[in-house]
Design a protein with these regions (language model features):
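Secretory targeting and sorting signals
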Residues: 2-37
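Bacterial lipoprotein signal-peptidase II cleavage site
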Residues: 30-58
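A cross-kingdom marker for long, charged
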Residues: 53-95, 99-130, 138-149, 154-423
Length: 423
């Protein structure tokens, strides 16, 4: 595929890759997309409620284009800007909404309220962004903008836009829940102690812990997914939410010798699902110690798509931690060996080491979400997971076993379909 490059500096108001006629409401998953789900509801503070329409006329995808930029180059700036954005959102909410969106920092709910399964399969924490007013929706997306780098916010926005395109254009019976996203805060938003921002739905599950005292940010664990991975808006703009990841993955693969590629592709791709306690087994494959300096940098560039989603300083700090144990990290790959989304069924890989776990898997099916002329499986339907065996949730809680369908199905497939079990 041809990579679309944005050569313009970001304008004061965000311009995301979706047409002005595009609308969004919210949510999808990592290995288990499921058709034929039914909506559920529960209490305002602990359960998921699905929405068929937003409180206003603006959808989540539209709100993502309405935020204003708040550039950060240091960890401290990101924490401060995100804290200000959280406070601004809370100021727009009612007392009941504020109670629903906030949790104690050490509440174990944070470990089971994100998933690669739809919002009707796994309860999300906090508020359904689709239920908010236009002002509140924009304020919620402003939190995400303040937290993320330009590239990461663009990728997240295009994941959201792709979900809405799927809802509007596909044969999915789940159109009413596609595009539904939730936002929650664990701990008090402040730049002097730790708190977590949780934002996600089906193909997005961001867990960012910001600690002003330690001057640190971690995105472990986080789920990024996309369906479809390549589509065109009504005004002719091509949207490829995962092009950066695909490009980095194949830059690494193509840097390897034939012998290294053979070791890589003969290895065991391991998978660890959201909501899974995970043993983080490394499996077999190519060792980090067998890479050249250039290859190591390319691998770290690939990992940074998950681990380095905030400012340059925090991204560099996490990169250094991962690099310190890269010799003991195992990489495995299966599937296609050429970046051509018109051929084959996509790629799968895992990167597993003492300080990093990344699982990437192309989904073998569309989960009933088919669009004429658009690939919605394989290359076009991907679930990924990023975790840190030493620092998930900044060690604020221990991962709890998922309820519902959060554990066994991701990212290899829904339970019972023969996919990896996530352990």
């Amino acid at each position: 595929m041809t990579k679309t490059t944005d050569t313009n500096k970001r304008p004061r108001r965000r311009q995301i890759l979706l047409g002005t006629s595009f609308f969004l409401v919210g949510g999808l998953v990592l290995s288990g997309c499921a058709a034929g789900t039914t909506s559920s509801s529960s209490s305002a503070t602990t359960g998921t409620s699905t929405s068929t329409s937003a409180a206003g006329d603006v959808t989540v995808a539209q709100a993502a284009t309405e935020v204003t930029e708040s550039d950060s180059s240091t960890t401290a700036e990101t924490i401060t800007n995100t804290t200000v954005a959280v406070e601004a959102l809370l100021a727009t909410l009612s007392d009941e909404q504020r109670a629903a969106v906030t949790y104690d920092y050490d509440d174990e709910t944070k470990t089971t309220s994100w998933s690669n399964f739809p919002v009707t399969f796994v309860d999300r924490a906090g508020l359904n962004v689709a239920d908010l007013t236009e002002e509140q929706q924009v304020a919620a997306l402003q939190v995400l903008e303040a937290l993320l780098s330009d590239d990461a916010y663009k990728a997240a926005s295009n994941i959201i836009a792709s979900d809405q395109y799927l809802a509007d254009s596909s044969s999915s019976s789940d159109a009413d829940i596609l595009g539904q996203y939730y936002i929650a805060f664990f701990g008090d938003a402040t730049d002097t102690s730790a708190y977590e921002v949780q934002f996600g739905g089906h193909h997005l599950g961001i867990n960012a812990t910001l600690d002003g005292t330690a001057d640190a940010i971690t995105f472990a664990p986080t789920h990024l997914g996309v369906q479809p991975a390549d589509w065109t808006t009504e005004d002719g703009t091509e949207v490829q939410a995962f092009d950066g990841i695909y490009t980095d993955a194949f830059a690494f693969y193509n840097s390897l010798t034939a012998e290294q590629q053979e070791t890589l592709t003969s290895g065991e791709v391991t998978m660890c699902a959201p909501g899974d306690t995970c043993e983080f087994t490394t499996g077999s494959g190519l060792m980090g110690s067998d890479l050249t300096d250039e290859q190591r940098e390319l691998l770290l560039d690939l990992i940074a798509n998950w681990s380095g989603m905030a400012d340059e300083e925090s991204a560099a700090a996490t990169r250094a931690e991962i690099e310190a144990t890269l010799d003991d990290t195992v990489i495995a790959w299966s599937g296609e060996t050429t970046y051509d989304m018109t051929q084959g069924d996509g790629i799968n890989f895992s990167i597993s080491g003492p300080n990093v776990y990344v699982g990437f898997q192309a989904q073998p099916g569309s989960a009933g979400a088919d669009i004429d002329g658009v690939v919605t499986s394989g290359w076009g339907h991907v679930h990924t997971i990023y975790r840190d065996p030493t620092n998930d949730y900044a060690n604020s809680v221990e991962q709890q076993a998922a309820t519902g369908m959060g554990g066994g199905g991701a990212p290899g497939g829904a339970p019972g379909d023969g996919g990896p079990d996530g352990n």
